[in-house]
Each structure stands twice: as C-alpha cells, then as structure tokens.
Amino acid sequence: MTKQDRRPEILVCNDDGIEGEGIHVLAASMKKLGNVTVVAPAEPHSGMSHAMTLGVPLRIKEFRRNNRFFGHTVSGTPVDCIKVALSHIMPVKPDLIVSGINYGSNTATSTIYSGTVAAALEGAIQGVTSIAFSLTTYEHADFTYAGKFARKLARKVLQKGLPADTILSANIPNVPESDIAGVVITRQGRSRWSEDAIERNDMYGNPYYWLNGTLRLQDSEMDKDEYAVRRNFVTITPLSFDLTNRDFLGTLEQWKLQQ
C-alpha cells in the first residue's frame, strides 16, 4: 500500500490536559481525515512553552472517556508528550501533528509562552508536519466552528505540505461561524502582556503570589495576528523554531568582536 492509498496517521496533543474540551473536539474532527492517536498531558500545562521533564520519570497511562479508550496521558509537558508519542506510543511516524484546540489565543508574545504552539514546534523539530490551533477565549468556549476549520486546514496541509522546520499557528475567534469575518495570513504581532503579581498570605502569614496579566494591543495592521483576530478574522501564522534575528546579523558582525 502506497502512502497515497492509506489513511494518514495523525497525532493529537494539547497543553490544557487530556480532559480539556478542545482536544476532544480536535480528535473527533481529525478522525474524519485519518487514523488518530491522542497523547496529552495528564494535567493542564498552559504556559509551559517548550519545557521538558528532566530528572523525573514520566508515567504513561491509558485514558478512557465514557468507558471507551480515548488516548494516553503523560505525566509531563506538551513537549514531553510529543517526544514520548513518537518514540514509544506510535508504531509509525505520523503524517501530521495537531495541537489544541487551546483555551485562549496564542498570538503575539503569547506565542512564546504557549505549550500548544511548543508541541507543534517539537513536531517540526522531529521532522513531522504540525499545526497549532487556539480559540480566543478562556470561558464560554464554543468549539463548533474551530473544529470545522481545523479539519479544513489540516486537510489542506496534508495535501500541500509545509516547508521544513515550519508550523502553522491558527487562531480562531470564539464567535458563531456567521460572524467570522474571513481568514487572513498574518505575522506574529508585537502585543505584550501587562502583568502583575498579586500578593496574598497563607494561614501562617507567609506571602505567596498569583501572576495576572492582560495582553495589551500594540499593533494596528491587519497582517498582525492579534489585531486581526480581535476583528473576528481567523489568523494563520507560519512559525519556525529558528529564532535568529537576521536583520541584526550584519550590524553585529561590524562589532568586530573577534579582534
């Protein structure tokens, strides 16, 4: 059987944990395209970025939903899940990795913190075509259109492929399909978090802190992800794990640090 004749093998992961609604919607959507394997963190790991577990053993367990096998949990980060899935759970290399659907957008500087995006980037590092999906809300989430769009984009990526070391990050407004303004290709924006550490005291009088913040819009162009998604556009941003600032290379060479 040739690759064209068989159903694609699709690995599904997230950072909200295996009980998050988004991963169940995404897995169901992907089953219409291929054979699905779900490997996700046992607990929520939002904001873990590209962290991986060292010095502590990882535990893998089967997860059942409604008395039916759904996937495997890993006692680690989203990146751990990708590594373990590729090395020990999946018998063959997947044709596609999809991560999400995340609670909350992953645009602008949020991209750097995102475990959802990191799982997809780890897939690219391992040579697997990968996509990250995020929904722009933390509450009252409606994944109906997001699941539908995820399938549409995944089908196109399976057909067209992606350049090496490149993923797609799709951010989807939490609105009915009728309110979607369109789909735009964007760059990662420059909006940044305005953060605060809220201090409280435990029962012994010792201080502890909750991190709290708001993403402040600093872009005003439709080709920036956060600006566009706030206007009900689905945004698709190509990303890479190569963080080199090429614009600065020439200037840095002029410093003549080798002398």
From Swiss-Prot:
Class of the enzyme per the UniProt entry, highest EC level: hydrolase
Source domain of life: Bacteria
Annotated SUPFAM superfamilies: SurE-like
Localisation: Cytoplasm
Entry EC number(s): 3.1.3.5
One Pfam family it belongs to: SurE
Needed cofactors: a divalent metal cation
Cellular component annotations (GO), alphabetically ordered: cytoplasm
GO molecular function terms attached to this record: 5'-nucleotidase activity; metal ion binding; nucleotide binding
Cofactor-binding details, from the entry: Binds 1 divalent metal cation per subunit.
Main location: cytoplasm
This protein's UniProt keywords: Cytoplasm, Hydrolase, Metal-binding, Nucleotide-binding
Binding site for a divalent metal cation: D15, D16, S46, N102
Catalytic reactions on record: a ribonucleoside 5'-phosphate + H2O = a ribonucleoside + phosphate
Alphabetized PANTHER family for the sequence: 5'-NUCLEOTIDASE SURE (PTHR30457), PHOSPHATASE, PUTATIVE (AFU_ORTHOLOGUE AFUA_4G01070)-RELATED (PTHR30457:SF0)
Physiological role: Nucleotidase that shows phosphatase activity on nucleoside 5'-monophosphates.
Family: Belongs to the SurE nucleotidase family.
The protein, known as: 5'-nucleotidase SurE
